[in-house]
A protein has these predicted regions:
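Conserved catalytic core of the tyrosine transesterase superfamily
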Residues: 1-207
């Protein structure tokens, strides 16, 4: 059993530059397209790795910009969004996947189990290998990409309840944990820069 099995790591999501550096390491062939696509759905849609591995090609709707998560945590079903850039990045793998046996979106490419589901350990191995190759020193794992997605949405001003639904959290408290990467230097100017309350609400207050 791995020594780190079940171990929790602090939220330390990779930066955009680090993620892109890793994506640039994916080779220009089918296996590389698949790893590239996996990074995309973990980062740009904020999926859990198991949710990504259970996706079917029919769960993707590029026209609507949506992905259907059939069995999220707690077996909850939800539909989530992904940006246009993310969809564009998926296309090479979608084209390559169409030439393989029908099955899950992310699958074994060669050998006797060709077309069957890819494993979460295989995903983690590839992400770690490519991160080392790219010179990324911080932990680069599926859940870190999910944290990066949540943090980026918060930076863009997306409401907490929408981030909660995108991530499939049962309560806002869990979502708040994902946003602990927002530091004091961001909080102070954001709150300091707020407008004063509406005049009708402050009528009669001493100035």
């Amino acid at each position: 059993m791995p020594r780190n099995k079940g171990q929790r790591y602090p939220a330390d999501p990779p930066t955009v530059a680090e993620i892109v550096a890793v994506m640039r390491q994916t080779p220009d062939k089918r296996h590389g397209y698949q790893v590239h696509a996996m990074i995309v759905v973990l980062w740009r849609a904020g999926l859990r790795v198991q949710e990504a591995l259970e996706l079917l090609e029919t769960d993707l709707d590029e026209h609507r910009g949506s992905l259907l998560v059939r069995h999220g945590k707690g077996r909850r079903r939800r539909e989530i969004g992904m940006d246009a850039w993310g969809w564009e990045q998926l296309r090479p793998w979608l084209a390559a996947r169409a030439e393989l046996p029908i099955g899950p979106l992310f699958c074994v490419i060669d050998g006797p189990t060709r077309g069957r589901a890819w494993s979460s350990s295989g995903v983690r191995f590839e992400l770690h290998r490519l991160a080392v190759q790219a010179g990324v020193r911080r932990r680069f794992a599926p859940h870190q990409l999910r944290h990066a997605h949540a943090l980026e949405l918060a930076h863009e001003g997306v409401a907490l309840n929408i981030i909660q639904r995108q991530l499939g959290h049962a309560n806002l408290g869990t979502t708040s944990i994902y946003l602990q990467g927002i530091d004091t230097e961001e909080i102070i100017p954001t709150v300091h820069g707020r407008r004063g309350p509406m005049m009708s609400a402050t009528a009669g207050l001493r100035l």
